[in-house]
Amino acid sequence: MHTDLGPDQKAEVLIEALPWLEEFFGKTIVIKYGGNAMVNDHLKECFAEDMVFLRQVGIHPVVVHGGGPQISQMLKALGIHSEFKGGLRVTTPEAMDVVRMVLTGKVSRELVGLINAHGPLAVGLSGEDAALFSASQRKPIIDGEPTDIGLVGDVVGVDASAVVDLIHAGRIPVVSSVAPNEDDATEVLNVNADSAAAALASALGAHKLVILTDVDGLYADWPDKNSLVGRIGVEDLRDLLPELESGMRPKMEACVRAIDGGVQQAHIIDGRKPHSILNEIFTTAGVGTMVEPGEGMELRSSYDL
């Protein structure tokens, strides 16, 4: 790997990471893998390296992923019509078969393979395995009316025992975001990966939830680039939620859910930047937006970087 850093600068980078390596040793961190990091080959490899790094320094990474772009691509290739209502994919039984196939048979397998190129570490499983997730079918309010969007649900229950077993065995769990219907375990629902990651982080008692996005973080006053938030208390974030763009809102709602569920910190970071996870976790300034219990907000423009 090419770097322009001299020996002294390399040493400074390592020393800066030392207190964070000590603080997070033995802790569980749930990472929601998504956005451009899932479709760019170089970023995929960087993500896999980050997961291996975390594991090798004594941290327990757990990955939860979706696969919206890959699902859309496969539906199109198979000639299956797919529509969205209120920003949510209408998931017919035919489309659900494709969702399961892509998430568990393609996205998961690829990521497991990239991680396992560094050693026999990753194990893929879905929300169906060992009843990891259970979900209730969702009928969102769209244009003031409850709307049927098919086999789409919200995670309402987590049995994390299978994931805990993998962590204790030194593995890196890679979890696909599908879940059996709580009312009919033979029916499988498509669930939002952000909220699934938050639910799993809470159930595991994780120290952190990290969500990869295609933006730098949360902006308090979008599109003002100087309003990028470095740290925000969950109470202030709650007040901001109604004002957020539709794409960012579910991610920030997941952060709120995680903090409310006992997770100490939740992060929104830019997955388009190589190794952004390591930069957020192991540097003092970080690179994205961190959500914590309590109140208050700091903009990154106020940091002495």
Swiss-Prot record:
Q: Per the record, where is site Transition state stabilizer?
A: K32, K251
Q: Which CDD domains match?
A: AAK_NAGK-C
The reply on keyword ATP-binding is yes
Q: Does the keyword Transferase apply?
A: yes
Location within or outside the cell: Cytoplasm
Which keywords, in A-to-Z order, does the entry hold?
A: Amino-acid biosynthesis, Arginine biosynthesis, ATP-binding, Cytoplasm, Kinase, Nucleotide-binding, Transferase
One GO cellular component, as annotated: cytoplasm
This protein's pathway? Amino-acid biosynthesis; L-arginine biosynthesis; N(2)-acetyl-L-ornithine from L-glutamate: step 2/4
Task: State which Enzyme Commission number(s) the record gives.
Answer: 2.7.2.8
Task: Output the GO biological process annotations, alphabetical, semicolon-separated.
Answer: arginine biosynthetic process via ornithine; L-arginine biosynthetic process
Q: Primary place of residence? A: cytoplasm
Which InterPro entries does the annotation name? AceGlu_kinase-like_sf (IPR036393), AcgluKinase_fam (IPR004662), ArgB (IPR037528), Asp/Glu/Uridylate_kinase (IPR001048), Glu/AcGlu_kinase (IPR001057), NAGK-C (IPR041727)
Q: Which reaction does it catalyse?
A: N-acetyl-L-glutamate + ATP = N-acetyl-L-glutamyl 5-phosphate + ADP
What Gene Ontology molecular-function terms does this entry list? Answer: acetylglutamate kinase activity; ATP binding
Q: Give the residues the record marks as binding substrate.
A: G67, G68, R89, N190
Q: Its function? A: Catalyzes the ATP-dependent phosphorylation of N-acetyl-L-glutamate.
Q: Which family does it belong to?
A: Belongs to the acetylglutamate kinase family. ArgB subfamily.
Record's protein name: Acetylglutamate kinase
- Gene encoding the protein: argB
